[in-house]
Amino acid sequence: MSFSDRLTRAADIARRAHNHQTRKGSDVPYLSHLFAVAALVMESGGSEDQVCAALLHDVLEDAGVGWSGEIRAELGEHVLALVVACTDGLPDAEGHKESWRTRKHRYIEHCLQDTPLAREALVICAADKLHNLRSLLIDLREHGPAALLKFVKDEPELRDKGEATLWYYETLLSIFERRGVSTARLLRPAVDALREIVRDLP
């Protein structure tokens, strides 16, 4: 499969939107995550629209809805719709987001929708969750359970954070497997590894 210059334009929007952002709790440029997710979508046979949306899947959530006009103008309505479908909650006018659990329940509801757009978006969502969980597992192995402290802000206890994180990934894995998303086969061993870690939390 060959790609048009739309992919270059998507990458440039991602660069400008996320250029000064880093991965949570680290100095790793946020762009690394976006390119990793796009690569996973390519490897699973994703379309050009899906790869472009993978590069942009966090733009509205992390850089603001003001980018939607440029995404639409440069890449089309369908790519924007995919980005919206992959978005995990938008901040309000003051920049505040809903609670972690509220956002995750809503995200799961979106993943359960059985529409052509939702099925396309699942390919991107699965790639996103796979890369996020792989990164979390690396952090857990390098830094121990304390790596969970930067997640699930509305759960005060470490074990509760771990169990909430495991619930989220297990629920999504079940959806991806039922819908036949190919990346689920890679996500399953990562979820199994997380389950072992959570089981041993104090």
Where are the regions that the model predicts?
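Active-site helical microenvironments for divalent-metal-assisted chemistry
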Residues: 1-202
